[in-house]
Amino acid sequence: MSNRREQRQQAQQFINELAGEAYPNSTRHYESGSRDDIRVAMRLIHQHDSLVGGTEDNPILEPNPPIPVYDTSGPYGDPKENIDVHKGLSPLRKTWIEERSDTRELDGVSSSFAKERENDIFTEDFRFIRSRKPLKAKAGKNVTQLHYARQGVITPEMEYIAIRENMGRQAIKDAELTQQHKGEHFGANLPETITPEFVRQEVAAGRAIIPCNINHPELEPMIIGRNFLVKINANIGNSAVTSSIEEEVEKLVWSTRWGADTIMDLSTGRNIHETREWLLRNSPVPLGTVPIYQALEKVNGVAEDLTWEMFKDTLIEQAEQGVDYFTIHAGVLLEYVHLTAKRVTGIVSRGGSIMAKWCLSHHQQSFLYEHFNDICEICAKYDVALSLGDGLRPGSVADANDDAQFSELRTLGELTKIAWEYDVQVMIEGPGHVPMHMIKENMEEQLKHCHEAPFYTLGPLTTDIAPGYDHFTSGIGAAMIGWYGCAMLCYVTPKEHLGLPNKEDVKQGLITYKIAAHAADLAKGHPGAQIRDNAMSKARFEFRWEDQFNLALDPHTARAYHDETLPQASGKVAHFCSMCGPKFCSMKISQEVRDVAKQAENLAPAQAAEKEKEKGMKDMANAFNKSGAELYHTADSKVELP
C-alpha cells in the first residue's frame, strides 16, 4: 500500500472514530452570559492538593484551585459532545443572526462556479450535503460587526468574546497565583477586566475585528486586536501534489485541539470548493482563504487569464459558503513591482507574484486595487473581514524593511480607510523574514500608516539558515512582534520551505506559536497571563509531577519525556527527576533550606526570650556588684540600688 493511501485511510479512520476529547485531568466548563444561549467554553485544569505538613500517615493538605485556560477546540474538546463530521457542528450563532432581522435567505447559491459544482455528478460522492441555504444582507442593510459597533450595539458575539477573554480568572483569589510582573505594553490598553462595551469600542475604532461571516454560524466568536490576547493562525489546505478532504478535516480538528484561534484554507489542488465546505461546516473557529488561489485554478494556473468578473464570482462563492476573512493582495501595484528587481529573493508571496505577473503582462493597474470598492461591497453583505495581504513581504533577511515592503504597507493603510467607509472589518498582514533588530520598526510603521488596524504576521523568521527548524526561527520573531503589538501570529511549521505539513508538523507549529503568543502576553503584562506560569512553578517546586504534565501546553510530550527515564509510578511522586537525581536536585535542596529556615523562624521567639532573660540577669548582677556586693544597706545609704 502506498504511503499516500495509508495517510488517507488513517485520516478516514480518525474522522470515523472522532469524539470529544478532554486534555489530561481537564474538564470543559461553560461560563454563562446574559442570555441562555451565551455559554462560553473554557478548559479547567484540575490540580492535586499541596502537602503542607503533618506526617506520612496523617498529612496536612492544602487544595489548589483549577486553572482556567482559553479553549479553541469547540465541541472537539468536550467528551459529552456527539460529533458527526458528515452533519457538521451545531449553528451556535443562528438565533443571534436571525434576531437582527437584517438578512435574507437566498433561493440557492449565486456563484456560477458553485452552481456548476452542485450540478457536477462527479462531485456527488465527496460533496458535503448542506442543509441550510446561504444568507445575504437585505437591501440597504449592513451586517458587519463593525457596523453594529459603530451604531452602539453590543451584539451577543461581543458579550461572548468579553467572557472568553477574561477566562474566568476573577474566580482565582490565591495571591501566589495572581501575582504578575508589570510588563511593557508599548501603548496598548489592557484593562483588568474585559467588558462587552470595551469589545464594542475596540471594534468600532477599527483596532480589533470579529471575523464571523453570517454563513458560518458554527463558529465560536473570537477577537483579533492588540488590546486582547495574542492569537495564532494555522494554515492547512491541499496542493496539486498531495492531501485529501479527509486529511484536511483531520488537520482542522487537530489544529483546534492544539490551540489554533483561526484556520486558513490555502488549498491549491483538486476539489477546493468541496474541501472548503467540509472545513467550514466542521470548524468552531473562523476560517480564512486567499481567493486568488482558487481563481487561478479556474484559469488552469495562467495568471494572465485572470479577470475581475471571475475573481468576483469566486468572492461570492466563498462568502456564501461562510469564509470569515479574505486575504486580498490589493496593495501590489504596478509601480511597485520594479522595486523588487534588486532583491535577493524577489517576490515570495504566491498571491503577490500572481498579481505582479498579471500587472506586467497587461501593463495595467491591479484589478484588485481598481475594484477594491466592489470587493468591500461584497464583504459588507456577508460580514467577511479583509486581511490585506503583504504580497511584497521580504522572503529573506537581506530584503527586510525595503522600499517595496513599506510602499505596499502605506497603500494598505489607504485601503483600510476605504474598507472602513463600508463598515468592513480589516486587519493588515505583515512579514516575513526580518532580523531581530529590525522587527520593532515593522510594528511602528504598521501602527503609523494603518491607523491601528490589527497586525497579522507570518513569523517573522529571524534567520534564513535553518530549514527544518523554521518553527524555531519564526517563533523568536513572533514572540517579539507579538510583544510589540501584533494581534495575530501565523504559525510556521518545520516543513516551511520544504513541503506540505502533515498532522504532526501542524502540532509542532501550533505549540511553538502558543509559546510565542503566551510569551508576548506575559511581556505586555496582559492581566491574568501569568496565572498558569505561577501554577506550574508552584507544582514544580512541590514535585507535583502529574500537575506539571497537565499544566503544560503539551501534556503528552511532557509526560513522555519524564517517563523515558522514570517510568515507574514512584517516579510521579519522587522529589527529583533524572536530570540531577535525588542528591543534586536544586528544588529539593531549596525545599530543605526553606524547611531549616522555617524551623529557625519558629525557634526564634523562644530564643529571643531566653536571651532577654539572660541579659536581664547579667544587668542585675552588674548592678549588685556596682552597689558594693553587699546583701543589706542602711536606710541612709547613698548607694544606688538595682
From Swiss-Prot:
Binding site for Zn(2+): 433, 497
GO BP term, pick one: thiamine diphosphate biosynthetic process
Cofactor(s) the protein needs: [4Fe-4S] cluster
Entry binding sites for [4Fe-4S] cluster: 577, 580, 585
Pfam families, per the entry: ThiC-associated (PF13667), ThiC_Rad_SAM (PF01964)
Class in the EC hierarchy, top level: lyase
GO molecular function: 4 iron, 4 sulfur cluster binding; carbon-carbon lyase activity; zinc ion binding
EC number: 4.1.99.17
Alphabetical list of InterPro entries matching this protein: ThiC, ThiC-associated_dom, ThiC/Bza_core_dom, ThiC/BzaA/B
Entry superkingdom: Bacteria
Annotated keywords: 4Fe-4S, Iron, Iron-sulfur, Lyase, Metal-binding, S-adenosyl-L-methionine, Thiamine biosynthesis, Zinc
Record field: catalytic activity: 5-amino-1-(5-phospho-beta-D-ribosyl)imidazole + S-adenosyl-L-methionine = 4-amino-2-methyl-5-(phosphooxymethyl)pyrimidine + CO + 5'-deoxyadenosine + formate + L-methionine + 3 H(+)
Cofactor: binding comment: Binds 1 [4Fe-4S] cluster per subunit. The cluster is coordinated with 3 cysteines and an exchangeable S-adenosyl-L-methionine.
Gene3D superfamilies in alphabetical order: 6.10.250.620, Radical SAM ThiC family, central domain
Pathway(s): Cofactor biosynthesis; thiamine diphosphate biosynthesis
Keyword DNA-binding on entry: no
Subunit field text: Homodimer.
The protein, known as: Phosphomethylpyrimidine synthase
Organism: Alteromonas mediterranea (strain DSM 17117 / CIP 110805 / LMG 28347 / Deep ecotype)
